[in-house]
Amino acid sequence: MKRSQGFNFHYQAHGYHPFLCYDGLTGDLIKAKLRDGTLHCSNGADKFRESIFQEYLERGIKTYLRGDSGFSSPKLYETCESNGCSYAIRLKQNPALIALASDKEEDLYQATQKDQISYAVTYGEFMYQAGSWKYPRRVVFKIEKPYGQLTHMYTFIVTNMDMEPYQIIQFYCGRGNPFRKIYHIQTV
């Protein structure tokens, strides 16, 4: 790495962007790789995961992946699919996704028309093909109306799992546990 590359002048230190992979059941760290802080999240994620997939496939162990929108890339989806890995990866909200979820948004609006204070939620799914994808994939979504707010919040997840949309959202939300460990690593 070049001397000035990845240097954060605000913190007066070099930034690093590690890959960390945790076991979803035990919380154990499976693999880590320190990377330059100037790299995008998804850059090389497919290759990082491939060796893990191979090791687990040889042992006959089923693999699952949850990832935030920073890891959303066709290369990673394809690596998961070709290695038998079930995945749930968040997509960044965009107008095309919102338009495809508009029927359920209308249902949520109708359901809360007489009570716009309480919390409300709806789930759905559709097939979607982004411009960089070779073929359509299943996208599940959640639309929430938070308590005391009139606006809606969206969650879009691309997946190859066969579960109900709400179950996939629950599975995806389990990714928060490793983030507590990552925070701990950063503060040590």
Q: Predicted segment positions?
A:
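Short, conserved catalytic/metal-binding motifs centered on acidic residues
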Residues: 1, 27, 64-72, 87, ...
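Active-site-proximal, Lys/Arg-enriched surface segment
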Residues: 1-20
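Gly-rich Lys/Arg/Thr-decorated short loops/hinges at beta-loop-alpha junctions or inter-strand turns
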Residues: 24-36
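Active-site beta-loop-alpha junctions of metal-dependent nucleic acid enzymes
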Residues: 33-55
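Active-site beta-loop-alpha junctions enriched in small/polar residues
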Residues: 35-37, 68-70, 92-94
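Short, surface-exposed basic-aromatic patches at helix termini and helix-loop junctions that form
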Residues: 57, 77-86
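A short acidic (Asp/Glu
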Residues: 73-78, 98-102
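An anionic, glycine-rich sequence signature occurring as long contiguous blocks
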Residues: 86-187
